[in-house]
Structures are given as C-alpha cells and as structure tokens.
A protein has these predicted regions:
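Conserved active-site alpha-helix within GNAT-family acetyltransferase domains
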Residues: 121, 133, 145-163
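Conserved acyl-donor/pantetheine-binding loop and adjacent beta-alpha core of acyl/acetyltransferases
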Residues: 75-107
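Conserved GNAT acetyl-CoA-binding A-motif
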Residues: 131-143
C-alpha cells in the first residue's frame, strides 16, 4: 500500500497491481483521460487498444496503481520486442542477438490529480525489477524532449539520452537507455 496525495490534498491509499486483460477498458480510459487533458498533444503518443492487448498476450506486463475505489490512477507498460522493428535497440544501433537483451518502458501515464507523487518513478523502478528478473541487460524508453517531467524522471533513474529523432509519425523523441 502506498500513501499518496490527490490534487485536493487528501491522503489516498494506492495499491500496486499487475494488470491483465480484464483491465483493458480502464487502461484505455486512463490513456484517453491523459490525452484529453494534454494541451500539447505531441507530448504523448497514445497506444492503440489492440497494441495493449498484444503486449499482454505476448509476454509483456502492464503494471499500475489503483485508488481506494479501485480506479486505475497510473500505469506503465513493459515489453520485450525481440527482433520486431519497434525494438528501441534498433534506435541504439544494436544488431543481432544484442536486440534480445533490450526491454522497454513502452508507456507510463499518471492521472493528473495524482501527479507529483513520484508514481512514474516508482512504476519505472518496478519495471526495472521485472527486467532484471528476466535477464535483460538494457532498458530503453522514449520521451518527448518537451516533457521535462518524464525526461527528468528517466535521467534521475540513471537513463541517458542516446538519440534525438523523429518517431511515431513525425514526433520528436529522445531515445533513453540504461544498462541494468
């Protein structure tokens, strides 16, 4: 149990959950909520429902926190993409079996009324634990250079900015990576 404050200053007990397909509607609702509230839409590249489903079916993990009403307030996606073109290892100029050593933090979102509690950092630390348990050597992610909060969270966690490039249909992104 994690004690956090919502934007009204009320202390809330948040519970860590490993999410499964039964949470797909809540996952989409949380992501839609984030997108609606973003003034600058280029800060976040949304994931399609089918992608979330395939991540769960293909060995990925979606983890998150729920509030006392069991509503999803934050989530993060962990996935290993192997030789698939979406593997950030390609962005890091890795080849061959080195690509199999890469896992990624595919998405992290925190509901606006719970920001400022370090939930993104906590979820990324939990993903790092998952990655270590699976023998992953490199953890990678992307973040908009204009999203200073996400970039700073990754930097504080020991990630380095490895590339600055256009991804996701022309959005500028830092590719960040960390050896674990």
């Amino acid at each position: 149990m994690l004690k956090i404050k919502n934007k009204l200053g009320i202390i809330v007990n948040a519970r860590y959950k490993i999410l499964d397909l039964s949470y797909i509607d809540e996952i989409m609702r949380l992501q839609d909520n984030i997108m609606e509230q973003l003034e600058d839409k280029q800060l976040y590249a949304p994931t399609e429902r089918e992608e979330f489903i395939s991540y769960l079916k293909d060995g990925g993990k979606i983890i998150g926190y729920v509030d006392e009403k069991n509503e999803l307030i934050a989530m993060a996606v962990y996935i290993k993409k192997g030789y698939e073109e979406g593997n950030y290892g390609y962005d890091l100029d890795l080849e061959g079996e080195k690509l199999l050593e890469v896992a990624q933090v595919e998405s992290t979102v925190v509901r606006s009324d719970y920001r400022g509690n370090g939930l993104q950092r906590i979820l990324c630390e939990k993903i790092e634990d998952i990655a270590k348990s699976e023998g992953v050597k490199i953890l990678a992610s992307t973040a908009s250079p204009y999203n200073k909060y996400s970039v700073n969270t990754f930097i504080k966690l020991g990630y380095e900015i490895k590339k600055d490039k256009l991804k996701y249909g022309g959005l500028r992104r830092y590719v960040l990576a960390k050896e674990i």
